[in-house]
């Protein structure tokens, strides 16, 4: 399969990124990164495990909910613990086993299937790397995706999409929200434009609560 947008001449793609950036008052590199983030989300939610995943975190607040302006490389995902064979209230020992099971699934199955999905979708010349871990029960696990940027790199943004997949968060409540790239939104009638797809995105109230809890944990560590 050939990706229609990537099949365009590089000069045409650069022009598209630049025009969208000028219209939205952001950098062309941010528009390019947004395209790759959108493609990554589409690939993730076309996997067999998709019904057991939700999109969460700060990037979901901007990408899915349009509540904040943020150009991040991070895609935070939560995987349903029941999918990994764990239900109900978990003891400390069970939580450790859950994290180990999640890490094993992400590194041995999810990581490989995602690479195959990229190839299937015609997303070529992309490099994947799985972040090294010190412990077998480390959660979340991180996957780095380095894409072939055609816009000059900025100091703040790198040509990388980073996926964090964790098992500790509950997947509810969530709402099906639109995922589309800025380029597709601005040029909906062009032959390269892809239709938006809805993906399960954690409700913002829960995301804000999780951020507060994380800050509390960090404060407790330094207190």
Regions found by a protein language model. Give the residues of each.
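Catalytic palm subdomain of template-directed nucleic-acid polymerases
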Residues: 79-104
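Acidic side chains
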Residues: 34, 74-76, 164
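Active-site nucleotide-donor binding segment shared across nucleotidyl transfer reactions
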Residues: 45-75, 79-87
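Catalytic cores of NTP-dependent nucleotidyl/adenyl transfer enzymes across multiple folds
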Residues: 5, 18, 38-41, 97-223
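Short secondary-structure transition/capping motifs
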Residues: 29-33, 67-68, 95, 99, ...
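Short charge-dense sequence patches
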Residues: 6-11, 54-66, 183-194
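Helical scaffold of the NTase/Pol beta-like nucleotidyltransferase catalytic core
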Residues: 1-54, 66
């Amino acid at each position: 399969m050939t990706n229609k947008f990537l099949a365009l001449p590089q000069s045409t793609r650069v022009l598209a990124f630049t025009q969208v950036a000028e219209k939205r008052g952001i950098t062309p590199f941010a528009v390019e990164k947004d395209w790759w983030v959108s493609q990554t989300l589409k690939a993730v939610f076309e996997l067999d495990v998709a019904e057991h995943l939700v999109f969460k975190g700060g990037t979901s607040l901007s990408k899915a909910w349009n509540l904040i302006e943020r150009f991040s490389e991070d895609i935070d995902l939560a995987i349903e613990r029941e999918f990994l064979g764990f239900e109900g209230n978990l003891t400390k020992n069970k939580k450790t086993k859950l994290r180990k099971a999640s890490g094993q699934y992400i590194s041995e199955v999810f990581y490989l299937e995602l690479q195959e999905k990229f190839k299937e979708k015609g997303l070529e010349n992309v490099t994947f790397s799985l972040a090294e871990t010190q412990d077998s029960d480390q959660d979340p696990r991180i996957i780095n995706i380095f894409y072939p940027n055609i816009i000059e790199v900025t100091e703040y943004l790198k040509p990388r999409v980073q996926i964090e997949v964790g098992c500790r968060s509950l997947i509810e409540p969530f709402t099906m929200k639109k995922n589309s790239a800025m380029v597709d939104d601005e040029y909906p009638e062009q032959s390269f434009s892809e239709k938006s797809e809805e993906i399960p995105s954690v409700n913002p109230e829960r995301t804000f609560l999780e951020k507060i809890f994380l800050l509390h944990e960090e404060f407790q560590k330094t207190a």
